Amino acid sequence: MIPGEILTDDGEHELNAGRPTLTVVVANTGDRPVQVGSHYHFFEANDALSFDRAAARGFRLNIAAGTAVRFEPGQTRTVELVELAGDRAVYGFQGKVMGPL
């Protein structure tokens, strides 16, 4: 085993099984690419991204940990979000929540 190596079983692994999800259409209205990481509170993503922010409160991208989605300028794409777990308190990011959801 190599330090940091992750060993998994063969086959497919379902991420976030049974957790509430939400599908949103996102448009990058800015002139620069925007990248959002797997555990970023999507509600607080870059203001150049146009989407239903109220619906996205308490959600993050439903993608593998450590990955990200890139939105090119002028691009519109549909993404799936998954509800935040744990104590459902959000601190940092853009400072729009700073406490329990």
Curated annotation (Swiss-Prot):
> Quick check: keyword Hydrolase in the entry?
yes
Organism annotation = Burkholderia ambifaria (strain ATCC BAA-244 / DSM 16087 / CCUG 44356 / LMG 19182 / AMMD)
Q: What class of enzyme is it?
A: hydrolase
Please name the pathway: Nitrogen metabolism; urea degradation; CO(2) and NH(3) from urea (urease route): step 1/1
- Highest classification ranks of the organism: Bacteria, Pseudomonadati, Pseudomonadota, Betaproteobacteria, Burkholderiales
- The name this protein goes by in its record: Urease subunit beta
The entry assigns this protein to a family as follows: Belongs to the urease beta subunit family.
Q: How does it assemble?
A: Heterotrimer of UreA (gamma), UreB (beta) and UreC (alpha) subunits. Three heterotrimers associate to form the active enzyme.
Quote the PANTHER family the UniProt record gives: UREASE
